[in-house]
């Protein structure tokens, strides 16, 4: 239980975004978390029952996706993010626009190294009725090297290191409250989520997948996730996360022109301990019980 509480605390900030993005890669969910945390039902599932044909198509997709994920050892890509909430503006037709837009880079190395860095962003200013650019050094930025998580907290001018307990190293990213994201294993996904293929009839080059949480531990983080995979190679194109209790949502899109699979990463340089910026304070935190 201590491991779950620790990861839940960390994931509520930095690694939560990482988990939502690396849904597309095949790390397993330890049985311990499933037994300890995913026992309380989230309520009646909203997903409709599937026909035998629909169930067979879903099963085929999940098995193929798991096999594809298992082959990926490193990945890097440019991402774009749009955030929609109650403060979002609307266009002339009443369609809600993004409250904020951002772009950055994501890097991953199996089984537990990751980097997430927002490099540019802009946010809606309701008084000016325009999008204001935000400072370049204000975006979310963190690095996980498998033994520690380094998080830049720009508003506090801090670089924080959170050391992971030894028993969690090598699998730390996968041991959070969202095994769906890091555990693209067919059996795990079916146990924890109500899933169905929702690809529009007019779309032929993508596969759209919807997932609804079956348990409260997952429903606390999202009410629904929609994934878009490229049909040619089952690599990620976009992910849309609907927040609990409302219409707020985050949309991520991954630029296929910048996607590098199993090449282009320096495992030492890309995931090493970051330098503390001038004027920042370095703070080291120990994991509970370590």
Regions found by a protein language model. Give the residues of each.
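A mature extracytoplasmic/lumenal domain signature
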Residues: 79-83, 110-112, 120-122, 148, ...
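A mid-sequence, solvent-exposed acidic-amphipathic segment
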Residues: 189-224
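N-terminal secretory signal peptides that target proteins for export/translocation
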Residues: 1-15
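Acidic/charged, solvent-exposed loop-and-adjacent secondary-structure segments enriched in E/D, K/R, S/T
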Residues: 150-180
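N-terminal mature ectodomain segment of secretory-pathway/periplasmic proteins
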Residues: 56-151, 155
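Bacterial N-terminal signal peptides
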Residues: 14-31
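Short, hydrophobic/aromatic-rich segments at coil-to-beta transitions
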Residues: 71-78, 111-117, 203-212, 233-240
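Non-transmembrane domains of secretory- and envelope-associated proteins
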Residues: 35-49, 155, 203, 215-224, ...
